[in-house]
Amino acid sequence: MQKVVRDSAISQSEEKLIQKVQKGFKGSLYTVLKAGTETAAGTNLQICLANLWAKLQKYYEDEDVSPVYFVNPQDVADYLGTAQITMQTAFGFTYIENFLGLGTAIVSPQVEAKKPIATAKENLRGAYVPMSGDVAQTFNLTADTTGLVGMTHSTKTGNATVDTLLMSCVKFFPEFQDGVFVGTISGE
């Protein structure tokens, strides 16, 4: 019984810690995206995203790219009202495929309301150390389901605790900052 309770407590703590680590590296991506140097505007979400799409088409004119938009959930709710949409989740990101026929929309409260962001999926880069490689072996880490966060536990008999070490070496960034467009929804 004690082992089950202990394992459950450790597992729940791990999940919360991993979520915090993932939120940190996602937050750093949003910070970089918010610093996009190009702009577009519209009176509502659909017009703003359409104008962002047009800017992407011009910027990436000679390239075959897939647009991706980052949108605040309140903007999506205000626009859609009671419409039926299907949201999906991968690596902690909530997204809608083919949103308004323009591309993938990632929905996050870390995006400022009325300030959607657009770039090409191909402009997004990631650098990371896999948590199943040499570093992980050195510290005896077990990778989470994404492979981006590693963890290990050690017991401390002096104060009867279980310490958890989490390690993550992840950085997401746009390759071209001027290929990131920040929209403004001005209202009607």
Predicted stretch roles:
Residues 1, 20-27, 82-90, 117-119:
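Short low-complexity stretches enriched in small and charged residues
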Residues 90-188:
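Sequence/fold signature of self-assembling virion shell proteins
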Residues 1, 5, 62, 72, ...:
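Alpha-helix initiation/capping motif
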Residues 35-105:
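Extended, solvent-exposed, turn-rich assembly/linker loops in the middle of proteins
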Residues 1-41, 159-168:
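Long, contiguous amphipathic alpha-helices that act as assembly "spine/axial" helices in icosahedral shell
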Residues 24-44, 111-126:
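Unusually extended, aromatic-enriched hydrophobic runs near protein termini
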